[in-house]
Regions:
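Catalytic cores of enzyme domains
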Residues: 136-288, 320-328
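Cysteine-centered iron-sulfur cluster-binding motifs in ferredoxin-type domains/subunits
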Residues: 255-267, 290-309, 324, 339-358
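Short acidic, hydrophobic short linear motifs in intrinsically disordered regions
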Residues: 50-61
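Short, amphipathic alpha-helical interaction segments positioned at domain boundaries
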Residues: 90-137
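A short, conserved structural fragment
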Residues: 76-95, 311-312, 360-361
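Long, low-complexity, charged/polar intrinsically disordered regions in eukaryotic proteins
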Residues: 1-29
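Short amphipathic alpha-helical interaction segments
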Residues: 61-77
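Flanking helices and flexible, charged tails adjoining ferredoxin-like Fe-S electron-transfer domains
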Residues: 317-392
């Protein structure tokens, strides 16, 4: 098969709002070859972000509709193809009718990269690392809105904060479902392949996506109590919720639908933004940590728990420690007390629930800084494309 076939698919994926950088070395082509067959690459290369039925695709590319349908369906669980559903139509198109299947090209991240656990080996891990360094990380992580959003851990926000942003209500998610998919972390596995070891935190940590109630329990399918307890343990250990937007799971309104649970030592987003030199990876939450100096004992727990090194001792003045409008906030760091670099803080709340003296709280950002969560795939894509256009 011609190299043009792989080039076409790479260009098509890069044309998506998520991005898939074209590098000088062509490492992205090697990632595609590692993950998919030639026939799969050819058909996927004919797709775009516009939703089409299998019959429409087959007619356009001149192939048998049964053959096209079979290939498309096989690529859905591997995330190279997205199955459209109500509320997820591309701009200018009507939402998919109930019972009608429409297909569109899926992104690399979040997408077929995370679905690559079945084929993940040292070669794939090295290719991904090279891709991130050569421009892939910046292309994916730098544009806004981010491909994932930070959701503060349970117990770090006031009830009124959660009421204002229902997509932060993790407990409501557990009440909506009885079964949950929890899978191994592809990032942690990649670190093990690259370095021969990883951190001691759990491998099974990601997903927590709701499943039909009749789904059989198993190694990766947990009931409500098991899933909630596991997520609670991960929160106490300092994992950060980098959550999926509701529309990625066909939710009709912004709501919590699942999350990666990330540690700074393994996470592809945290690691990738550092390798790429990107200031911000996941979309920050609308809250920032504030430390009250009076109950703070300078124990250092928050410094150790912060995944982005946004907290330090007050004597080591941070560049973003400036007079703050938040009630009770520190306006100047006190020697020996912990202080938050507001510009670096991502609003994850990990420091809040780990403070033994309850000296840390989360405060909302100003209305000018407030990030309004996209309510549909079309909304997210259009906002990201507008951002990209403005950068040119």
């Amino acid at each position: 098969m011609s190299e043009d076939t792989y080039e076409r698919l790479a260009n098509a994926i890069d044309a998506l709002p998520h991005g898939f950088a074209r590098t000088a070395s062509g490492v992205e082509i090697e990632l595609i070859k590692k993950a998919f067959t030639e026939d799969e690459v050819w058909l996927a290369g004919q797709l775009t972000r516009t939703s089409e039925t299998a019959a429409e695709i087959a007619q356009r590319v001149g192939r048998d509709v049964g053959e096209v349908t079979a290939t498309l369906e096989s690529l859905i669980p591997r995330r190279l193809v997205r199955l459209d559903s109500p509320g997820m139509a591309a701009p200018g198109l009507a939402p998919t009718a109930v019972g009608e299947k429409k297909y569109r090209l899926g992104p690399f991240l979040v997408g077929w990269y995370e679905a690559s656990m079945r084929l993940l080996d040292k070669e794939f891990a090295e290719l991904f690392e090279k891709f991130v360094v050569e421009g892939g990380g910046e292309r994916i992580f730098a544009p806004r809105p981010g491909v994932l959003g930070v959701v503060p851990v349970r117990g770090s926000l006031k009830p009124e904060h959660v009421e204002r942003e229902p997509h932060l209500d993790i407990d409501a998610h557990f009440q909506r479902h009885e079964r949950f998919l929890v899978i191994p972390c592809v990032c942690k596995r990649e670190i093990e392949l690259l370095h021969g070891k990883s951190c001691k935190k759990p491998m099974k940590r990601c997903g927590f996506v709701g499943l039909p109630p009749q789904t059989p329990l198993g190694e990766t399918v947990l009931d409500r109590e098991e899933a909630s307890k596991l997520l609670g343990r991960l929160e106490k250990m300092g994992h950060v919720h980098l959550a999926f937007y509701g529309f990625t799971m066909s939710a009709e309104s912004p709501q919590f639908v699942g999350t990666w649970n990330c540690c700074s030592c393994c996470c592809g987003v945290f690691h990738g933004q550092k390798l790429a030199g990107v200031a911000e990876g996941a979309q920050k939450s609308n809250y920032r940590a504030v430390i009250d100096p009076d109950p703070c004992t300078a124990c250092g727990a928050c410094i150790l728990r912060c995944p982005v090194d946004a907290i330090a001792e007050g004597a080591k003045r941070l560049p973003s420690v400036i007079p703050c409008v938040c009630a009770g906030a520190m306006t100047e760091p006190e020697p020996g007390k912990s202080v938050v670099d507001r510009d670096k803080c991502i609003g994850c709340g990990v420091c809040v629930i780990g403070c033994p003296t309850e000296a840390i709280r989360m405060e909302p950002v100003s209305e000018e800084e407030w990030f309004h969560v996209p309510n549909s795939m079309a909304d997210w894509e259009e906002r990201r494309l507008e951002y990209l256009a403005a950068q040119k």
